[in-house]
């Protein structure tokens, strides 16, 4: 006690208030508060039900995309975080849901509005004639240069992009090659234009791959939120049938009880 008042957590206060005024809050008396373990288990059951129910369509595509991007445990962790923040997310996204995310995320990632993976790949096209000339030049160099020329010969065709030539510019770990890793010193000295071309296109490739990765993240986020919408709805239906409330529900119902519902004035008077 402090100054005669009992100090309670916000959730304990909300639970006590809802047990005093369940009908006024629009909930059934005798509700059960879910522990974190119960909430996690309910979320997992809801996810499995959604997966069984949606064998095709948008939700199925979202589930497949999320499954490709992460494992089941991480997926459940992400869904739990989204479910816990569902009220704030609903206020933020409004009725648009996941479709509202790309215009929000693109500026945060410094992606131009409306940018697509197709446009990025188109921007990574290269001049086939220029690279044919580069291959001829590389064939005059040592063994490593001749191997680079062979790689260009195999990939330099109509429709190819710098992505197909990525091993010229990047190591197996995906790191940029140094100038000496792009072309031999002797050939770079004799043919400086060749090194300039390789360095310029290396930078162009790095920027393009970064943009594609960011677009993948945006797409994965949209798919995750689409899946989460179906899972959150299923969890809500299950909780309603079993008369269960989680911690977020306590705050939601008390907020409505004290502000939005017609009985608010009477409840405040009784308090």
Task: Please provide the spans of the model-predicted regions.
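Conserved P-loop NTPase-based nucleic-acid remodeling module centered on helicase motor cores
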Residues: 1-64, 100-104, 113
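Conserved NTP-handling cores and scaffolds of large molecular machines
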Residues: 14, 21-25, 47-58, 70, ...
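Conserved helicase NTPase motor core
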Residues: 6-15, 31-44, 200-271
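Accessory nucleic-acid engagement/destabilization modules that flank
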Residues: 12, 45-75, 87, 126-133, ...
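Generic alpha-helix signal with a bias toward terminal, lower-confidence helices
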Residues: 17-33, 43-46, 62-63, 75-78, ...
């Amino acid at each position: 006690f402090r100054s005669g008042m009992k100090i309670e957590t916000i959730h304990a206060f909300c639970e006590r208030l809802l047990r005093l005024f369940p009908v006024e809050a629009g909930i059934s008396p005798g509700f059960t508060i879910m522990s974190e373990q119960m909430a996690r288990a309910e979320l997992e059951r809801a996810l499995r039900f959604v997966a069984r129910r949606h064998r095709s369509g948008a939700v199925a595509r979202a589930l497949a995309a999320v499954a490709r991007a992460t494992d089941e445990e991480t997926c459940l962790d992400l869904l739990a975080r989204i479910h816990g923040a569902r009220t704030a997310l609903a206020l933020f996204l409004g009725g648009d849901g996941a479709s509202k995310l790309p215009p929000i995320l693109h500026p945060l990632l410094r992606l131009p509005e409306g940018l697509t993976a197709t446009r990025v790949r188109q921007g990574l096209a290269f001049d086939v004639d220029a690279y044919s000339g580069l291959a001829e030049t590389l064939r005059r160099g040592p063994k490593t240069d001749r191997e680079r020329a062979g790689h260009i010969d195999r990939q330099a065709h109509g429709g190819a992009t710098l992505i197909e030539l990525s091993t010229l510019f990047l190591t197996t770990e995906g790191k940029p090659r140094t100038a000496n890793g792009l072309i031999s010193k002797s050939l770079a000295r004799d043919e400086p234009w060749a090194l300039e071309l390789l360095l310029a296109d290396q930078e162009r490739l790095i920027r393009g791959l970064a943009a594609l990765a960011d677009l993948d993240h945006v797409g994965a986020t949209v798919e995750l939120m689409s899946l989460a919408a179906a899972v959150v709805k299923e969890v809500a239906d299950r909780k309603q049938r079993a008369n269960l409330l989680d911690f977020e529900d306590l705050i939601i119902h008390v907020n409505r009880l004290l502000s939005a519902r017609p009985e608010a004035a009477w409840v405040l008077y009784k308090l």
